[in-house]
Amino acid sequence: MSSLQILQGTFRLSDTKTLQLPQLTLNAGDSWAFVGSNGSGKSALARALAGELPLLKGERQSQFSHITRLSFEQLQKLVSDEWQRNNTDMLGPGEDDTGRTTAEIIQDEVKDAPRCMQLAQQFGITALLDRRFKYLSTGETRKTLLCQALMSEPDLLILDEPFDGLDVASRQQLAERLASLHQSGITLVLVLNRFDEIPEFVQFAGVLADCTLAETGAKEELLQQALVAQLAHSEQLEGVQLPEPDEPSARHALPANEPRIVLNNGVVSYNDRPILNNLSWQVNPGEHWQIVGPNGAGKSTLLSLVTGDHPQGYSNDLTLFGRRRGSGETIWDIKKHIGYVSSSLHLDYRVSTTVRNVILSGYFDSIGIYQAVSDRQQKLVQQWLDILGIDKRTADAPFHSLSWGQQRLALIVRALVKHPTLLILDEPLQGLDPLNRQLIRRFVDVLISEGETQLLFVSHHAEDAPACITHRLEFVPDGGLYRYVLTKIY
């Protein structure tokens, strides 16, 4: 029986990036779905399975005789090439309508009219065979390319994002055709963006995060794992309404168009050694910033200025939430606008308590709960738990029984219950494995995009940023100091 096996595989993506596939076996007749967000490495996985990526370490062994990979990029190129014929000298004598027919596209590599007709019947596109390919709809072009791939009778077919750009009816129709292919004995691999795209017939599944195959297994068992189930739940949250704050947010007292942070030529030094050196930075309403740089660059020092904790804040031209530092404001005038989560807070949260109580403690800015909790606060926290996809059993389980990423996510929600003006996440991915990192990024995107809180996301690497980031402040080594690069993310 044919199979493809990868053991401790490291595949080259670029000079600085690799794809990690610890262990994977595809047997003849299997149907697999691999799910990952943009940048997770799922398209690289498709190429690795097809034997198109250099193997740096480990083993890749395949007994499949004919592997075919199809991607959305290939489809786009084919359509583009057909339209390009109008702008070239590829016109034949007397030809006034350039572009090949659907039948010609299907038989591009294998000329076999009876098989072409058989496949067209199987995919319901016989009426399109004489039509110019470039005039077909997205769903029709997808079926045409599948027919083209099947002309050569592959024994392993890899489809990269086959449902992308299709409407609900077209997705269902394509899934039914793929189920028929699977029943005919073809080994099938689907690479997908979302868990809810996995067709019912699929037997096995895997999850990619940070260019690592993080989990694999029988589909139903995998989808029931707590982390995977929570990631799948996050796909259903678009447009969700966040729970109200228990009391009106301090944000509402701020003028709508007033900058949240203004630092002009900021300087902080220790023993005459500059830590921040003439940094000018402004955070306007609606902006979400990533602050990125190596250890010792001054990121934490900048955060301590923003939170009002650094004594040299008074000697700088610094305005926080409309109040110039040193103008009579108290530390609490600043902190009422800020939610803060760091790995050190995570380590400090050592009290023995439940997940529910950790989130409730956000209403009191305490580690643990030492006062009465109102019925309204209990109801609001239940709404937050529902958004996180945490059931009652898990909510009332010990906080430290959750995965490290789930704990950190609970602390992020703890910081959000008051709907602060600014949420500061200081190295929120530190110490997390790829799947937990993906969990944090995904929920941060949801929670920030559906609310009005602004984000400061601090990390070592630009690629750590969640999708909601609009601007980046980068600390770049420059001699013995650092220079500052401010970028708008498009």
Swiss-Prot record:
Cited Gene3D superfamilies: P-loop containing nucleotide triphosphate hydrolases
Binding locations of ATP 1: 36-43
GO BP of this protein: DNA repair
Regulation: induction: Probably part of the modE-modF operon.
A GO term from the CC aspect: ATP-binding cassette (ABC) transporter complex
Bilayer topology annotation: Peripheral membrane protein
Highest taxon, organism lineage: Bacteria
InterPro entries: AAA+_ATPase, ABC_transporter-like_ATP-bd, ECF_ABC_transporter_ATP-bd, P-loop_NTPase
Family (UniProt): Belongs to the ABC transporter superfamily.
Record function comment: Probably not involved in the transport of molybdenum into the cell.
Protein name: ABC transporter ATP-binding protein ModF
Source organism per UniProt: Escherichia coli (strain K12)
